């Protein structure tokens, strides 16, 4: 692998995943990952542009930012690219009325959306809401439509909380795809449109940006396919087998966000 200076040269913007990179969710809101609060502060004091890019779909953007601030992070709503607001924009543009299979914590993001007589389904990480009854209702709505449309806020397989690994929205999305014989439209990582909007909001080109995440497929693979560079942290959902993934190879592997920031401040924007 090339030297760090070569791999990080010309980076002007940094996209940060949140869960598994900044903090691990769980009881009482979860816990910041060691060194991550100061790492974010150091990045923001540098010349590099910083944006937070998350597939979080159990909390509204306001609630997520509130949690991060309580954990000590310097972050504002305007710095966060999240899938629920992006999905609302798509629904309005296309005149769609969703049946929502989402967590109560994110439902407020859809307050301005008409959900009467639904002509599509939006699925997110509903947690305990993924009951047979709720999954079957989403299935029935889709099967009654002539042209069924399913939106999924991300398609992650699992994520890490302080109590252990938790199933993400992806397995439930796949179940509805299989049952209905359709393919979901993913809003969130690894969708190219999601990375595009985050970079536009940050004001940098793909080749000038780097993604830092714990998901080898959604964060690293998605960013690289869009023309960005990507580092994987060995925190959150990281597993040692990720470093030998058959299809995705990160531009570098670091122990945590603090190490990534050390390297970026040493080598980026040169």
From Swiss-Prot:
Instruction: List locations, semicolon-separated.
Output: Cytoplasm; Nucleus
What are the binding positions for substrate in this chain? 17-19, 54-55, 189
Per the record, what are the reactions this protein catalyses? diphosphate + H2O = 2 phosphate + H(+)
Q: Which UniProt keywords apply?
A: Cytoplasm, Hydrolase, Magnesium, Metal-binding, Nucleus
Provide the GO MF annotations for this entry. inorganic diphosphate phosphatase activity; metal ion binding; phosphatase activity
Tissues with expression: Detected in liver (at protein level).
- Under Enzyme Commission nomenclature, its number is 3.1.3.-, 3.6.1.1
**Cofactor(s) the protein requires to work:** Mg(2+)
Residues that coordinate or bind Mg(2+) = 17, 19, 214
Matches recorded under Gene3D superfamilies:
HAD superfamily/HAD-like (3.40.50.1000)
One GO cellular component assignment for this chain's record is:
cytosol
Assembly and interactions? Homodimer.
Q: Report the PANTHER family cross-referenced here.
A: 4-NITROPHENYLPHOSPHATASE-RELATED (PTHR19288), PHOSPHOLYSINE PHOSPHOHISTIDINE INORGANIC PYROPHOSPHATE PHOSPHATASE (PTHR19288:SF44)
Question: Which family is this protein grouped under?
Answer: Belongs to the HAD-like hydrolase superfamily.
* Protein name listed in UniProt: Phospholysine phosphohistidine inorganic pyrophosphate phosphatase
Q: Which gene encodes it?
A: LHPP
């Amino acid at each position: 692998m090339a030297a760090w200076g070569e791999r990080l040269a010309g980076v002007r913007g940094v996209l940060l995943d949140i869960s598994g990179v900044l903090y691990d969710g769980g009881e009482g809101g979860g816990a910041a990952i060691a060194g991550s609060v100061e790492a974010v502060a150091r990045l923001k004091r540098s010349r590099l542009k910083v944006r937070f890019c998350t597939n979080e779909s159990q909390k509204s953007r306001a609630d997520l930012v509130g949690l991060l601030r309580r954990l000590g992070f310097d972050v504002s709503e305007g710095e966060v690219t999240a899938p629920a607001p992006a999905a609302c924009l798509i629904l309005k543009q296309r005149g769609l009325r969703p049946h929502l299979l989402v967590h109560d914590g994110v439902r407020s993001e859809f307050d301005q959306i008409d959900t009467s007589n639904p002509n599509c389904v939006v699925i997110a990480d509903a947690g305990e809401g993924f009951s047979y009854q709720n999954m079957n209702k989403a299935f029935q709505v889709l099967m009654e439509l002539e042209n069924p449309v399913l939106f999924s806020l991300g398609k992650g397989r699992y994520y890490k909380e302080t109590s252990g690994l938790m199933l993400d929205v992806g397995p439930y999305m796949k179940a509805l795809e299989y049952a209905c014989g359709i393919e979901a439209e993913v809003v969130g990582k690894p969708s190219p449109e999601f990375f595009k909007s985050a970079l536009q909001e940050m004001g940098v080109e793909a080749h000038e940006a780097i993604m830092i995440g714990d998901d080898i497929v959604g964060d690293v693979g998605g960013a690289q396919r869009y023309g960005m560079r990507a580092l994987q942290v060995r925190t959150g959902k990281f597993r040692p087998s990720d470093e030998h993934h058959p299809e995705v190879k990160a531009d570098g592997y670091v122990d945590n966000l603090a190490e990534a920031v050390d390297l970026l401040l040493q080598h980026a924007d040169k």
